[in-house]
Protein backbone atom coordinates (compact mmCIF):
# COMPACT_ATOMS: atom_id res chain seq x y z
CA UNK A 1 0.00 0.00 0.00
CA UNK A 2 2.49 2.62 1.20
CA UNK A 3 -0.04 5.41 1.74
CA UNK A 4 0.12 8.25 -0.73
CA UNK A 5 1.68 11.31 0.93
CA UNK A 6 0.38 14.82 0.44
CA UNK A 7 3.54 15.47 -1.59
CA UNK A 8 2.07 13.28 -4.32
CA UNK A 9 -0.39 16.04 -5.16
CA UNK A 10 2.05 17.73 -7.52
CA UNK A 11 2.28 14.50 -9.51
CA UNK A 12 -1.47 14.03 -9.41
CA UNK A 13 -2.01 17.45 -10.96
CA UNK A 14 0.31 16.43 -13.80
CA UNK A 15 -1.71 13.25 -14.34
CA UNK A 16 -4.82 15.31 -14.95
CA UNK A 17 -3.18 17.68 -17.44
CA UNK A 18 -2.80 17.44 -21.19
CA UNK A 19 0.18 15.32 -22.19
CA UNK A 20 1.58 13.34 -25.08
CA UNK A 21 -0.06 10.02 -24.34
CA UNK A 22 -3.29 8.39 -25.40
CA UNK A 23 -6.50 10.23 -26.12
CA UNK A 24 -9.32 10.05 -23.58
CA UNK A 25 -11.70 9.73 -26.49
CA UNK A 26 -11.38 6.79 -28.89
CA UNK A 27 -11.47 7.55 -32.58
CA UNK A 28 -14.93 7.90 -34.05
CA UNK A 29 -16.69 4.60 -34.51
CA UNK A 30 -14.09 2.67 -32.51
CA UNK A 31 -16.21 0.56 -30.18
CA UNK A 32 -13.81 -2.32 -29.66
CA UNK A 33 -14.15 -3.34 -26.03
CA UNK A 34 -11.20 -3.33 -23.67
CA UNK A 35 -11.52 -7.10 -23.28
CA UNK A 36 -11.34 -7.56 -27.04
CA UNK A 37 -8.41 -5.18 -27.33
CA UNK A 38 -6.46 -6.96 -24.59
CA UNK A 39 -7.08 -10.42 -26.05
CA UNK A 40 -3.82 -11.95 -27.24
CA UNK A 41 -1.74 -8.90 -26.32
CA UNK A 42 1.51 -9.69 -24.52
CA UNK A 43 2.89 -6.84 -22.47
CA UNK A 44 6.64 -6.35 -22.63
CA UNK A 45 8.16 -5.23 -19.37
CA UNK A 46 11.16 -2.92 -19.43
CA UNK A 47 11.82 -3.77 -15.78
CA UNK A 48 10.99 -6.90 -13.81
CA UNK A 49 10.04 -5.62 -10.39
CA UNK A 50 8.69 -7.38 -7.34
CA UNK A 51 8.47 -6.13 -3.79
CA UNK A 52 9.91 -9.19 -2.05
CA UNK A 53 8.22 -8.21 1.21
CA UNK A 54 6.20 -10.61 3.36
CA UNK A 55 2.61 -9.72 4.17
CA UNK A 56 2.48 -8.31 7.72
CA UNK A 57 0.28 -10.26 10.11
CA UNK A 58 -3.01 -8.37 10.55
CA UNK A 59 -4.88 -7.69 13.78
CA UNK A 60 -8.16 -9.47 14.45
CA UNK A 61 -9.92 -7.06 12.10
CA UNK A 62 -8.63 -9.18 9.19
CA UNK A 63 -7.31 -12.61 8.31
CA UNK A 64 -4.63 -13.31 5.72
CA UNK A 65 -5.89 -15.45 2.84
CA UNK A 66 -4.62 -16.43 -0.59
CA UNK A 67 -6.54 -16.40 -3.84
CA UNK A 68 -5.74 -17.98 -7.20
CA UNK A 69 -4.94 -15.60 -10.06
CA UNK A 70 -3.32 -16.15 -13.46
CA UNK A 71 -0.05 -15.09 -11.80
CA UNK A 72 -0.33 -17.72 -9.05
CA UNK A 73 -1.47 -17.62 -5.44
CA UNK A 74 -1.67 -14.02 -4.19
CA UNK A 75 -2.12 -12.79 -0.63
CA UNK A 76 -5.01 -10.69 0.64
CA UNK A 77 -6.53 -9.36 3.83
CA UNK A 78 -10.16 -10.33 4.30
CA UNK A 79 -12.68 -9.59 7.02
CA UNK A 80 -13.53 -12.55 9.26
CA UNK A 81 -16.67 -14.11 7.82
CA UNK A 82 -19.90 -13.76 9.82
CA UNK A 83 -21.21 -17.05 11.17
CA UNK A 84 -24.88 -16.08 11.15
CA UNK A 85 -25.82 -18.17 8.12
CA UNK A 86 -26.74 -15.07 6.09
CA UNK A 87 -25.38 -13.70 2.83
CA UNK A 88 -23.62 -10.35 3.19
CA UNK A 89 -22.43 -7.65 0.78
CA UNK A 90 -18.69 -7.43 0.20
CA UNK A 91 -16.29 -4.94 -1.30
CA UNK A 92 -12.85 -5.33 -2.82
CA UNK A 93 -10.71 -2.28 -2.15
CA UNK A 94 -7.58 -1.38 -4.11
CA UNK A 95 -5.27 1.02 -2.32
CA UNK A 96 -3.40 3.95 -3.79
CA UNK A 97 0.34 4.28 -4.22
CA UNK A 98 1.89 0.85 -4.65
CA UNK A 99 -1.43 -0.90 -5.11
CA UNK A 100 0.28 -4.27 -5.69
CA UNK A 101 1.39 -4.42 -2.05
CA UNK A 102 -0.65 -4.57 1.16
CA UNK A 103 0.59 -3.63 4.61
CA UNK A 104 -0.51 -2.23 7.96
CA UNK A 105 -1.70 0.96 6.28
CA UNK A 106 -5.08 -0.70 5.70
CA UNK A 107 -5.89 -0.90 9.42
CA UNK A 108 -3.87 1.85 11.12
CA UNK A 109 -5.96 4.73 12.43
CA UNK A 110 -5.72 7.72 10.12
CA UNK A 111 -6.84 11.35 10.34
CA UNK A 112 -10.14 12.12 8.59
CA UNK A 113 -8.45 14.49 6.17
CA UNK A 114 -6.30 11.63 4.84
CA UNK A 115 -7.93 8.30 5.71
CA UNK A 116 -6.90 5.79 3.06
CA UNK A 117 -8.10 2.75 5.04
CA UNK A 118 -11.68 2.71 3.67
CA UNK A 119 -12.60 1.58 7.18
CA UNK A 120 -16.16 2.88 6.79
CA UNK A 121 -17.06 -0.36 5.02
CA UNK A 122 -15.91 -2.77 7.72
CA UNK A 123 -17.34 -0.52 10.42
CA UNK A 124 -20.71 -0.80 8.64
CA UNK A 125 -20.47 -4.60 8.70
CA UNK A 126 -19.60 -5.00 5.02
CA UNK A 127 -17.12 -7.80 4.29
CA UNK A 128 -13.86 -6.26 3.04
CA UNK A 129 -11.01 -7.69 1.04
CA UNK A 130 -7.73 -5.95 0.28
CA UNK A 131 -5.99 -8.03 -2.39
CA UNK A 132 -2.30 -7.77 -3.09
CA UNK A 133 -1.43 -8.17 -6.75
CA UNK A 134 1.25 -9.78 -8.87
CA UNK A 135 4.75 -8.66 -7.94
CA UNK A 136 3.54 -7.16 -4.67
CA UNK A 137 4.68 -8.40 -1.26
CA UNK A 138 6.25 -11.84 -1.79
CA UNK A 139 3.78 -12.79 -4.51
CA UNK A 140 4.74 -14.56 -7.73
CA UNK A 141 5.01 -12.59 -10.94
CA UNK A 142 6.18 -9.07 -11.64
CA UNK A 143 4.44 -5.72 -11.47
CA UNK A 144 2.88 -4.87 -14.83
CA UNK A 145 1.52 -1.40 -14.10
CA UNK A 146 -2.25 -1.68 -14.69
CA UNK A 147 -2.25 -4.64 -17.11
CA UNK A 148 -2.10 -8.13 -15.60
CA UNK A 149 -3.30 -6.60 -12.36
CA UNK A 150 -6.76 -6.29 -13.92
CA UNK A 151 -6.90 -10.10 -14.09
CA UNK A 152 -5.82 -10.29 -10.44
CA UNK A 153 -8.68 -8.03 -9.35
CA UNK A 154 -11.19 -10.17 -11.22
CA UNK A 155 -9.68 -13.32 -9.69
CA UNK A 156 -10.03 -11.78 -6.22
CA UNK A 157 -13.72 -11.18 -6.95
CA UNK A 158 -14.09 -14.83 -7.93
CA UNK A 159 -12.56 -15.81 -4.59
CA UNK A 160 -14.96 -13.56 -2.70
CA UNK A 161 -17.96 -14.94 -4.56
CA UNK A 162 -17.10 -18.45 -3.35
CA UNK A 163 -17.15 -17.51 0.34
CA UNK A 164 -20.24 -18.91 2.04
CA UNK A 165 -21.06 -15.67 3.88
CA UNK A 166 -20.79 -13.47 0.77
CA UNK A 167 -23.71 -12.66 -1.48
CA UNK A 168 -22.15 -13.20 -4.93
CA UNK A 169 -24.66 -10.77 -6.45
CA UNK A 170 -23.60 -7.97 -4.08
CA UNK A 171 -19.86 -7.72 -4.63
CA UNK A 172 -18.65 -4.14 -5.05
CA UNK A 173 -15.28 -2.75 -6.10
CA UNK A 174 -13.55 0.42 -5.00
CA UNK A 175 -10.15 2.05 -5.12
CA UNK A 176 -8.24 5.29 -4.67
CA UNK A 177 -5.72 7.08 -6.89
CA UNK A 178 -3.65 4.39 -8.67
CA UNK A 179 -6.17 1.95 -7.20
CA UNK A 180 -8.94 4.10 -8.64
CA UNK A 181 -7.36 3.82 -12.07
CA UNK A 182 -7.12 0.04 -11.74
CA UNK A 183 -10.73 -0.43 -10.63
CA UNK A 184 -11.90 1.60 -13.63
CA UNK A 185 -10.00 -0.77 -15.90
CA UNK A 186 -11.59 -3.73 -14.10
CA UNK A 187 -15.05 -2.18 -14.57
CA UNK A 188 -14.27 -1.84 -18.26
CA UNK A 189 -13.29 -5.52 -18.41
CA UNK A 190 -16.14 -7.27 -16.59
CA UNK A 191 -19.77 -6.94 -15.52
CA UNK A 192 -19.29 -9.01 -12.39
CA UNK A 193 -19.42 -6.07 -9.92
CA UNK A 194 -22.72 -4.70 -8.66
CA UNK A 195 -21.21 -1.20 -8.63
CA UNK A 196 -17.73 0.30 -8.79
CA UNK A 197 -16.40 3.35 -6.91
CA UNK A 198 -13.27 5.02 -8.26
CA UNK A 199 -11.62 7.87 -6.35
CA UNK A 200 -9.17 10.16 -8.12
CA UNK A 201 -8.20 7.97 -11.08
CA UNK A 202 -6.10 8.98 -14.05
CA UNK A 203 -7.68 8.90 -17.47
CA UNK A 204 -4.30 8.34 -19.12
CA UNK A 205 -1.51 6.50 -17.29
CA UNK A 206 1.13 8.33 -19.35
CA UNK A 207 0.99 11.02 -16.67
CA UNK A 208 2.17 8.71 -13.90
CA UNK A 209 5.80 8.62 -12.83
CA UNK A 210 8.13 5.88 -14.11
CA UNK A 211 7.93 3.99 -10.82
CA UNK A 212 4.35 3.02 -11.75
CA UNK A 213 5.08 2.16 -15.40
CA UNK A 214 7.51 -0.79 -15.69
CA UNK A 215 6.86 -1.27 -19.41
CA UNK A 216 8.04 0.42 -22.60
CA UNK A 217 6.16 3.71 -22.44
CA UNK A 218 7.20 4.60 -25.99
CA UNK A 219 4.88 1.82 -27.20
CA UNK A 220 1.55 3.55 -27.69
CA UNK A 221 -0.44 0.32 -27.47
CA UNK A 222 0.99 -0.48 -24.04
CA UNK A 223 -0.30 2.89 -22.82
CA UNK A 224 -3.68 2.64 -24.53
CA UNK A 225 -4.56 -0.69 -22.92
CA UNK A 226 -3.82 0.73 -19.47
CA UNK A 227 -5.60 4.09 -19.83
CA UNK A 228 -9.24 3.89 -18.66
CA UNK A 229 -10.28 7.14 -20.31
CA UNK A 230 -10.05 5.39 -23.65
CA UNK A 231 -12.44 2.57 -22.77
CA UNK A 232 -15.38 4.19 -20.99
CA UNK A 233 -17.75 2.68 -23.55
CA UNK A 234 -16.74 -0.76 -22.19
CA UNK A 235 -18.19 -0.13 -18.71
CA UNK A 236 -20.88 -2.74 -18.06
CA UNK A 237 -22.08 -1.99 -14.52
CA UNK A 238 -22.73 1.22 -12.55
CA UNK A 239 -19.50 3.15 -12.04
CA UNK A 240 -19.08 6.25 -9.89
CA UNK A 241 -15.95 8.37 -10.24
CA UNK A 242 -15.17 10.93 -7.53
CA UNK A 243 -12.55 13.64 -7.10
CA UNK A 244 -12.22 16.77 -5.03
CA UNK A 245 -12.13 20.19 -6.65
CA UNK A 246 -9.18 21.44 -4.62
CA UNK A 247 -6.32 19.16 -5.64
CA UNK A 248 -5.66 15.93 -7.46
CA UNK A 249 -6.93 14.46 -10.72
CA UNK A 250 -9.89 16.77 -11.30
CA UNK A 251 -8.92 17.45 -14.91
CA UNK A 252 -8.86 13.71 -15.59
CA UNK A 253 -12.38 13.37 -14.18
CA UNK A 254 -13.59 16.30 -16.25
CA UNK A 255 -12.00 14.91 -19.42
CA UNK A 256 -13.70 11.55 -18.92
CA UNK A 257 -17.04 13.17 -18.11
CA UNK A 258 -16.88 15.13 -21.36
CA UNK A 259 -15.92 12.17 -23.52
CA UNK A 260 -18.21 9.51 -22.03
CA UNK A 261 -21.61 8.73 -23.51
CA UNK A 262 -22.05 5.61 -21.37
CA UNK A 263 -25.10 5.98 -19.12
CA UNK A 264 -23.54 3.62 -16.57
CA UNK A 265 -20.63 5.99 -15.91
CA UNK A 266 -21.21 8.80 -13.38
CA UNK A 267 -18.69 11.53 -12.58
CA UNK A 268 -18.80 13.64 -9.42
CA UNK A 269 -16.50 16.54 -8.56
CA UNK A 270 -16.89 17.29 -4.86
CA UNK A 271 -16.63 20.96 -3.94
CA UNK A 272 -14.10 21.78 -1.24
CA UNK A 273 -12.62 18.28 -1.06
CA UNK A 274 -9.07 17.24 -1.91
CA UNK A 275 -7.73 14.01 -3.38
CA UNK A 276 -7.46 12.72 0.20
CA UNK A 277 -10.13 14.44 2.30
CA UNK A 278 -12.84 13.16 -0.03
CA UNK A 279 -12.28 9.59 1.14
CA UNK A 280 -13.58 9.43 4.73
CA UNK A 281 -17.02 11.06 4.32
CA UNK A 282 -17.68 9.63 0.87
CA UNK A 283 -16.81 6.04 1.76
CA UNK A 284 -19.09 6.38 4.79
CA UNK A 285 -21.89 7.54 2.48
CA UNK A 286 -21.23 4.68 0.06
CA UNK A 287 -21.27 2.13 2.88
CA UNK A 288 -24.70 3.33 4.00
CA UNK A 289 -26.00 3.06 0.44
CA UNK A 290 -24.58 -0.45 0.02
CA UNK A 291 -26.48 -1.65 3.09
CA UNK A 292 -29.73 -0.41 1.52
CA UNK A 293 -28.90 -1.76 -1.94
CA UNK A 294 -30.79 -5.04 -1.64
CA UNK A 295 -32.94 -5.24 -4.78
CA UNK A 296 -32.38 -7.32 -7.91
CA UNK A 297 -30.26 -4.52 -9.43
CA UNK A 298 -28.24 -1.78 -7.80
CA UNK A 299 -30.21 1.33 -6.87
CA UNK A 300 -27.24 3.41 -5.75
CA UNK A 301 -27.19 7.05 -6.83
CA UNK A 302 -25.56 10.19 -5.46
CA UNK A 303 -26.72 13.79 -5.33
CA UNK A 304 -24.31 16.69 -5.48
CA UNK A 305 -25.81 18.04 -2.27
CA UNK A 306 -25.06 14.94 -0.20
CA UNK A 307 -21.55 14.65 -1.60
CA UNK A 308 -20.72 18.32 -1.02
CA UNK A 309 -22.34 18.63 2.41
CA UNK A 310 -19.34 17.43 4.51
CA UNK A 311 -17.16 20.11 2.92
CA UNK A 312 -19.57 23.05 3.11
CA UNK A 313 -18.13 26.13 4.79
Placement of each model-derived feature along the sequence:
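C-terminal catalytic histidine-bearing segment of alpha/beta-hydrolase fold enzymes
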Residues: 95, 254, 262-313
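Short substrate-entry loop that stabilizes the transition state in hydrolases
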Residues: 84-88, 93-141
